[in-house]
């Protein structure tokens, strides 16, 4: 592909350049591009042929109408009215208690006074919906606390100071006042009032500004300034009264909320996430249960998440990294219906307790990230915070965000420090067995490479100085969202092909949908203008602009000839004016955003632009609207504005990439189908290895999908693991989105499955950047219903509506994870935010002990994952090699080798575990071999996890019952039984080795209120026993479990073996001849089929598919008229003479046998480049370049002739 500044001759030559592994192609065929005139002879149709084509056109309309009806039947939930309003509880009665014997006690009434003054000063009280605080009833408090404890606290109302002090001294870090009980009841009741308001649809979200705090309070224990656990009571209250099944509790207080954790650590209906200062247990509350290794017990395993900070001075980038890499992916899989935040602000810079360096703007970002969950049902409950100014500003910033104000830009975001990277990596290691979305969330690197990274980080980071925090301000906007559109852009049309996918109706249908939903009326409509000559010349050559302008006066025949000089282009007399108007509209929107006229905007424009090069039109594009808009923004701002361009069009934006590849002020990120270089625009420009050049090295980021079916889970995984970490580190001042919607489900070109809800979430997550200054500019998208619904969903997000609930039917595909990982590996040297890695110790771990545990009942459909703890085993089939990874006790990377987490694949292993049955590199528990999973179960009631009574003792795989055999566990120095078994699986040797695991002194990291006053004693307690009488009782010691017998595992592998061959075909073959599957009827590569239906919880290897033909193909122009002699479906192969199974080429009408006979048609395609062939067996048409079946009205004529010859009658209907 041409680079910036090359002439059009080079541009035309680029079209014939092929991937070295791709079949040869002649000049008559291009991908997603028109055939060059004269390359393939075409006769002029006579009147009879024209009439017949008209008849076939009517038949073809039925299929298109069915597609539209199907899309219209999607449950897009866009008509639902978005809730508005932020609730606030702030009651003066909560200040009626203080420490009687210590006036300097940090938790005092002045905390709420400072907050109230700040909110009044910023005018926030008037913008909120105020709610009267109420007292929590005893019955409500008893949802979490014991009646005896509540009664004891009630008696404090009548105690004198001496008695209060004596009682307080029996607890850790508390004081008591005669009004403490009533204020604690009022604080809990305040949160419950907001729960009623949010779940009762009175408001969208809310904040309870209360004291005393609550997250340290336990079942029967006062602790850490806390009497009653407000968020814990609120969670149980929501479940009991409002029938909420799944609650997410986020605790960002600098102290670990052990009281909340202990309340729910065996409950899969509550996901608890805490990010706190730990310092290897040296920081209060000094509990091992506060470390990353504690993930819950019993059915609650995996539902407790701790990200411990092991040093002070942690910054915004560290907190954001934990949210992006850990919390958000897990929360999306969990699917909470309500989010509660234990919102302590003692991690803010200047707080005497926390000694951290987070900023109010950082907490605004965290709040914004959480607002995308649970349909926006979010409640913040004040916990700690003891620097009055920092506390007031932190509360104010979070409340601004709840109200819909844009997040302030971070002053010095940078990247997470090495200590934060270690903590996040350890948390991911501990959680990966329990959450499908976290599979391969960290990648293994050798210790030598990690040491090189550490040297680089030391050089890059340098000594850190606390920034001088500015006074945060929020813009006063006339309108929130600008909308630019002009019907005149519909004048650009194809004069020769009315069925070309880039039709004028694209923008009309979008605008009609925006108006139907009332979204257009909520936006500020901006009048577009044509781009000026100077604006166009910032990205395009004067010669090219003049050349395109000259087309306005060309005749039809000249326009047709001119169109053939470019890739996939049609030109009409109005093309130049429309392209100029589309680009000018984008520039007008940039002006409105940068001037503060609007916060963000959407440009509904055509023709698209991201393929347009400096001196050449390409791929339906003439002027690169996004690129010109970016340069215009830098021009009017007067400096090299940092601009992030995100291109989520399914095709790689080659033109945009080339225009900024040497410019570090513009970060270009593209997610697109690449298919090993065979998907348009073809070549290697869209590969992950393309990183920019010169000063722009590292500022070009390509996530190259190597297949179809990419959906919400895949794009969000890329967002969390790659796009957002880099974006926050870059810290853009403006975000431009090349918003093509051809990756949407139902699009005829993309073959992907992104939903409108998915696009809404992608948009929302980007809105935290650049102070909310984001502009969406329409690119591709060729299903009118899909693009209309998708743009409407994005517009709602821009307007501040919470993203709709997003149910992910499956985890990310293995192919998607491979693409994301490939890009991360390329870019981790340029972006420190990507260095969340496992460490490969070349010497191996000092201990090979493997401790397995029994999963009582899976709260998620990954039963097998729950059969190993953080000490994981990597199994390599065919080699008999087992790599055991043992985490040292409460360790993190950076400690001694014996305490280092090591889980790695060998160097020569492929990156994906199950490819053609050749290599198996999965944990025993995962057992996803041959494309299926052991013991998958689903719960109809709990999307993100099973209900508490869900039990499983036998798992059915492929129709076979796999009994979980058990053995006795020796505890207290004894070892688990060692079992070794080798059996042949598909020709490979599978060696199952379970190493010894010493369980000396195993304890649970938990305190109990009755036996450990002060919350410091660590005691051993048994796990809850299983409720299923068929399941053997679990071991009473955490970390021990009966093992799966070798015979059971081998039997399951044999059951699953059948799927490995078909799965391996698509992922292991090169994009050359061997991957041109599907020539024979029914022989299409399943990975290239359109997804029709799937079972929730299944991996990509186990999804069920049906072959669905594409309704349009860019290579249909290569179909030539039928020869006068007609077709003979009995004609033998032109090479070998077989009549067994033959295909006819639709360009030259030669007949050859299929790939499963002698493969002569495949050879013909390789020699001629002719793309489309028709099966004489079932009359299906196959396109080699699209790697898909195609059914379009252009094929109906030849299909009907073949049908007549085969059956003696016309086709009754399209099939």
Curated annotation (Swiss-Prot):
It catalyses: N(6)-acetyl-L-lysyl-[protein] + H2O = L-lysyl-[protein] + acetate; N(6)-acetyl-L-lysyl-[alpha-tubulin] + H2O = L-lysyl-[alpha-tubulin] + acetate. Deacetylates a wide range of non-histone substrates. Plays a central role in microtubule-dependent cell motility by mediating deacetylation of tubulin. Required for cilia disassembly via deacetylation of alpha-tubulin. Alpha-tubulin deacetylation results in destabilization of dynamic microtubules. Promotes deacetylation of CTTN, leading to actin polymerization, promotion of autophagosome-lysosome fusion and completion of autophagy. Deacetylates SQSTM1. Deacetylates peroxiredoxins PRDX1 and PRDX2, decreasing their reducing activity. (Microbial infection) Deacetylates the SARS-CoV-2 N protein which promotes association of the viral N protein with human G3BP1, leading to disruption of cellular stress granule formation and facilitating viral replication. Belongs to the histone deacetylase family. HD type 2 subfamily. It is linked to Chondrodysplasia with platyspondyly, distinctive brachydactyly, hydrocephaly, and microphthalmia: A disease characterized by chondrodysplasia, severe platyspondyly, hydrocephaly, and facial features with microphthalmia. Bone abnormalities include a distinctive metaphyseal cupping of the metacarpals, metatarsals, and phalanges. Affected females show a milder phenotype with small stature, sometimes associated with body asymmetry and mild intellectual disability. GO terms for biological process: actin filament organization; aggresome assembly; antiviral innate immune response; axonal transport of mitochondrion; cellular response to heat; cellular response to hydrogen peroxide; cellular response to misfolded protein; cellular response to parathyroid hormone stimulus. The active site is at 216 (1), 611 (2). Transmembrane segments: none annotated. Residues 1-11, 18-28 have a biased composition (Low complexity). Zn(2+) 3 binds at residues 1145, 1148, 1164, 1170. A motif (Nuclear export signal) lies at residues 67-76. Pathway: Protein modification; protein ubiquitination. This is Protein deacetylase HDAC6. One of its GO terms (molecular function) is tau protein binding. Phosphorylated by AURKA; phosphorylation increases HDAC6-mediated deacetylation of alpha-tubulin and subsequent disassembly of cilia. Ubiquitinated. Its polyubiquitination however does not lead to its degradation. InterPro entries: HDAC_PDAC, His_deacetylse, His_deacetylse_dom, His_deacetylse_dom_sf, Ureohydrolase_dom_sf, Znf_RING/FYVE/PHD, Znf_UBP. Residues 1018-1047 have a biased composition (Polar residues). GO terms for cellular component: aggresome; axon; axon cytoplasm; caveola; cell leading edge; centrosome; ciliary basal body; cytoplasm. The modification Omega-N-methylarginine is found at residue 33. Residues 1154-1156, 1182-1189 are annotated as: Ubiquitin binding. Binds 3 Zn(2+) ions per subunit.
């Amino acid at each position: 592909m041409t680079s910036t500044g090359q002439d059009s001759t080079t541009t035309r030559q680029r079209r014939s350049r092929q991937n070295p592994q791709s079949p040869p192609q002649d000049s008559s065929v291009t991908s997603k591009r028109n055939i060059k005139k004269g390359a393939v002879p075409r006769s002029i149709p006579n009147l009879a042929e024209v009439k017949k084509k008209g008849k076939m056109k009517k038949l073809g309309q039925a299929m298109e109408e069915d597609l539209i009806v199907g899309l219209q039947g999607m449950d897009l939930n866009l008509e639902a009215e978005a809730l508005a309003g932020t609730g606030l509880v702030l009651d003066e009665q909560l200040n009626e208690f203080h420490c009687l014997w210590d006036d300097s006690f940090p938790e005092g009434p002045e905390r709420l006074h400072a907050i109230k003054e700040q909110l009044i000063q910023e005018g926030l009280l008037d913008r909120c919906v105020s709610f009267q605080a109420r007292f929590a009833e005893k019955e409500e408090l008893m949802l979490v606390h014991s009646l005896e404890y509540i009664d004891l606290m009630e008696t404090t109302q009548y105690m004198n100071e001496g008695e209060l002090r004596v009682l307080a001294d029996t607890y850790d870090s508390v004081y008591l006042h005669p009004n403490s009980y009533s204020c604690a009841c009022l604080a809990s009741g305040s949160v419950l009032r907001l729960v009623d308001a949010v779940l009762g649809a009175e408001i969208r979200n809310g904040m309870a500004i209360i004291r005393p705090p609550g997250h340290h309070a336990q079942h029967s224990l006062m602790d850490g300034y806390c009497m009653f656990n407000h968020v814990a009571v609120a969670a149980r209250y929501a479940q009991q009264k409002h029938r909420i099944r799944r609650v997410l509790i986020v605790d960002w207080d600098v102290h670990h909320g052990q009281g909340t954790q202990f309340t729910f650590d065996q409950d899969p209906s509550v996901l608890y996430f805490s990010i706190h200062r730990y310092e290897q247990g040296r920081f209060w509350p000094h509990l091992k249960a506060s470390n990353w290794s504690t993930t819950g017990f019993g059915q609650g395993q995996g539902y407790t998440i701790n990200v411990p900070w092991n040093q002070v001075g942690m910054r915004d980038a560290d907190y954001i990294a934990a949210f992006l890499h850990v919390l958000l992916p897990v929360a999306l899989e969990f699917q909470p219906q309500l989010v509660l935040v234990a919102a302590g602000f003692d991690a803010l810079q200047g707080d005497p307790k926390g000694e951290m360096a987070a900023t109010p703007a950082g907490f605004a970002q965290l709040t914004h990230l959480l607002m995308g969950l649970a349909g926006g049902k979010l409640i913040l409950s004040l916990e700690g915070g003891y620097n009055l100014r920092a506390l007031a500003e932190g509360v104010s910033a979070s409340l601004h965000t709840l109200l819909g104000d844009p997040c302030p830009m971070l002053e010095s975001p940078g990247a997470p420090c090495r200590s934060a990277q270690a903590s996040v990596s350890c948390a991911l290691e501990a959680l990966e067995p329990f959450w499908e979305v976290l599979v391969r969330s960290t990648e293994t690197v050798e210790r030598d490479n990690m040491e090189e990274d550490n040297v680089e980080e030391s050089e890059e980071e340098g000594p850190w100085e606390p920034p001088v925090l500015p006074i945060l301000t929020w813009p006063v906007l006339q309108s929130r969202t600008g909308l630019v559109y002009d019907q005149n852009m519909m004048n650009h049309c194809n004069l020769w092909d009315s069925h070309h996918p880039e039709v004028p109706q694209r923008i009309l249908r979008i605008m009609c949908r925006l108006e139907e939903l009332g979204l257009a009326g909520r936006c500020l409509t901006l009048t577009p203008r044509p781009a000026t000559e100077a604006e166009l010349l910032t990205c395009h050559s004067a010669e090219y602009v003049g050349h395109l302008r000259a087309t306005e006066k060309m005749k039809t025949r000249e326009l047709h000839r001119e169109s053939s000089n470019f890739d996939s282009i049609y030109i009409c007399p109005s093309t130049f004016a429309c392209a100029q108007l589309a680009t000018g509209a984008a520039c007008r929107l940039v002006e409105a955003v940068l001037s503060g006229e609007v916060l963000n905007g959407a440009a509904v424009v055509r023709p698209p632009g991201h393929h347009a090069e400096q001196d050449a039109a390409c791929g339906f594009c003439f002027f690169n609207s996004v690129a010109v808009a970016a340069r215009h923004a830098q021009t009017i701002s007067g400096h090299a504005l940092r601009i992030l361009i995100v291109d989520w069009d399914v095709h790689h934006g080659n033109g945009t990439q080339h225009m900024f590849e040497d410019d570090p002020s513009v970060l270009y990120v593209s997610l697109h189908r690449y298919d090993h270089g065979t998907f348009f625009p073809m070549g290697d420009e869209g590969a992950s290895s393309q990183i920019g050049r010169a000063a722009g090295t590292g500022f070009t980021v390509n996530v190259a999908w190597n297949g179809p079916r990419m959906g919400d889970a895949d794009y969000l995984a890329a967002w969390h693991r790659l796009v957002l970490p880099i974006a926050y580190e870059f810290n853009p001042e403006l975000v431009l989105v090349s918003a093509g919607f051809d990756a949407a489900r139902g699009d005829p070109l993309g073959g992907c499955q992104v939903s409108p809800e998915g696009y809404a979430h992608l948009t929302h997550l980007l809105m935290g950047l650049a102070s909310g200054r984001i502009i969406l500019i329409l690119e591709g998208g060729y299903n009118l219903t899909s693009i209309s619904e998708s743009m409407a969903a994005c517009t709602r997000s821009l307007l501040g509506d919470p993203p709709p609930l997003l149910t992910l039917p499956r985890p990310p595909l293995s192919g998607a994870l491979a693409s994301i990982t490939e890009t991360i590996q390329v870019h981790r040297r340029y972006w420190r935010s990507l260095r969340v890695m496992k460490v490969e110790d070349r010497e191996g771990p000092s201990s090979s002990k493997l401790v397995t545990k029994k999963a009582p009942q899976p709260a998620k459909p990954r039963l097998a994952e729950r059969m190993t703890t953080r000490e994981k085993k990597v199994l390599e089939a065919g080699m008999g090699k087992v790599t055991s990874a043992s985490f040292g006790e409460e360790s993190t990377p950076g400690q001694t080798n014996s305490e280092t987490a090591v889980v790695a694949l060998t160097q020569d292993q492929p990156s994906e575990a199950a490819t053609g049955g050749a290599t198996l590199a999965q944990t025993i528990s995962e057992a996803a071999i041959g494309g299926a999973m052991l013991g998958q179960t689903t719960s109809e009631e709990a999307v993100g996890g099973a209900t508490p009574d869900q039990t499983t003792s036998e798992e059915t795989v492929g129709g076979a019952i796999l009994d979980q055999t058990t053995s006795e566990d020796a505890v207290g120095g004894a070892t688990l039984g060692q079992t070794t078994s080798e059996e042949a699986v598909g020709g490979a040797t599978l060696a199952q080795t379970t190493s010894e695991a010493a369980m000396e002194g195993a304890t649970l990291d938990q305190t109990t209120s009755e036996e450990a006053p002060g919350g410091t004693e660590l005691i051993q307690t048994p796990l809850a026993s299983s409720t299923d009488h068929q399941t053997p009782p679990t071991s009473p010691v955490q970390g021990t479990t009966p093992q799966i017998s070798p015979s059971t595992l081998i039997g399951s592998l044999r059951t699953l073996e059948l799927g490995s061959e078909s799965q391996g075909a698509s992922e292991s073959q090169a994009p050359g001849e061997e991957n041109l599957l599907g020539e024979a009827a029914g022989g299409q590569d399943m990975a290239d089929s359109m997804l029709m239906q799937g079972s929730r919880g299944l991996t990509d290897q186990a999804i069920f598919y049906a072959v669905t033909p594409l309704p349009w193909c860019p290579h249909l122009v290569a179909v030539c008229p039928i020869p006068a002699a007609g077709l003979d479906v009995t004609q033998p192969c032109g090479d070998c003479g077989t009549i067994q199974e033959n295909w006819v080429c639709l360009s030259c009408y030669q007949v050859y046998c299929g790939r499963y006979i002698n493969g002569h048609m495949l050879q013909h395609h390789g020699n001629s480049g002719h793309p489309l062939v028709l099966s004489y067996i079932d009359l299906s048409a196959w396109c080699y370049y699209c790697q898909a079946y195609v059914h379009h009205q252009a094929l109906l004529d030849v299909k009907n002739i073949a049908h007549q010859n085969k059956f003696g009658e016309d086709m009754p209907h399209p099939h």
